[in-house]
Design a protein with these regions (language model features):
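Terminal-region recognition feature
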Residues: 1-192
C-alpha cells in the first residue's frame, strides 16, 4: 500500500480486512452526469461501475456486500448501478442502513438478497424534477416512461407488484407537502 493511501486509510479510520467479499458503500446522494458540490456527500456512478466490473472479474472475490444509506439522486446513474448489480454472476447482498430513499429502492432490490435494519427507512415517491419545462406534454411522457423504468425494475427484482408500488408512490396521506410513502424496516418488508 502506498504511503499516501495508507495515511488516507488511517485518517478515515478504515481497517482493511483480508476477505473474499467485496464491500461497496453507496452513501449520500447518487451523483450522475451533473457534478454535486464538494461539500455534498455523494456516490459517483463513474467510480461504482468500474469497481463492480473489477469485482465481477476478480477470481479472488466470491461475493458482494452493498451497504446503503442514500437519500437518492440521479435516476439514470442509480438505474445503471442497479442494473449492473442485478446482472452480476457473483452473489450480492444489500443492507439498508439509515435510508434507501428514492433511487435507493432499485439499488436495494438489485441484489440477490436485500436486507433492511428495523430503524432504516425507504421513501417511495413519483419521479421528480426541477427547472423549467418547455414542452409540458412531452416532458410528462418522458417522466412517465422514466417512472415506468423504475417501477418495472423494482417489481422485477422484488416481491411487490408494479401496481402496489405505484399505489405507494402516489399516496397523498403519508408525506407532508408531498406524494409518496415512507416505510421503516419492518414495513418495507411487509409492504412488498
Amino acid at each position: 500500500m502506498a504511503e499516501s493511501q495508507k495515511n488516507q486509510t488511517e485518517k478515515e479510520n478504515i481497517v482493511e480486512l483480508k476477505t473474499n467479499i467485496y464491500l461497496l458503500s453507496i452513501i449520500g446522494e447518487v451523483e450522475g452526469h451533473e457534478s454535486l458540490g464538494e461539500r455534498t456527500k455523494a456516490t459517483r456512478y463513474e467510480h461504482i461501475l468500474p469497481a463492480l466490473a473489477r469485482a465481477e472479474e476478480d477470481k479472488s472475490i466470491d461475493g458482494l456486500l452493498i451497504l446503503l444509506n442514500t437519500v437518492g439522486g440521479d435516476v439514470e446513474a442509480g438505474l445503471a448501478i442497479a442494473e449492473m448489480i442485478a446482472s452480476m454472476r457473483k452473489p450480492a447482498v444489500s443492507l439498508v442502513l439509515g435510508g434507501g430513499h428514492s433511487i435507493g429502492v432499485p439499488l436495494a432490490v438489485a441484489a440477490d438478497y436485500s436486507l433492511i435494519v428495523p430503524s432504516a427507512t425507504m421513501v417511495i415517491h413519483p419521479v421528480r424534477t426541477n427547472g423549467m419545462f418547455i414542452g409540458v406534454a412531452q416532458t410528462y411522457r418522458n417522466m412517465e416512461k422514466t417512472q415506468d423504468r423504475i417501477t418495472g425494475f423494482v417489481s422485477a427484482h422484488s416481491k411487490i407488484t408494479k401496481e402496489r408500488l405505484e399505489e405507494l408512490m402516489l399516496d397523498t396521506k403519508m408525506l407532508v407537502k408531498d406524494v409518496g410513502t415512507m416505510l421503516d424496516g419492518p414495513q418495507a418488508v411487509k409492504k412488498a
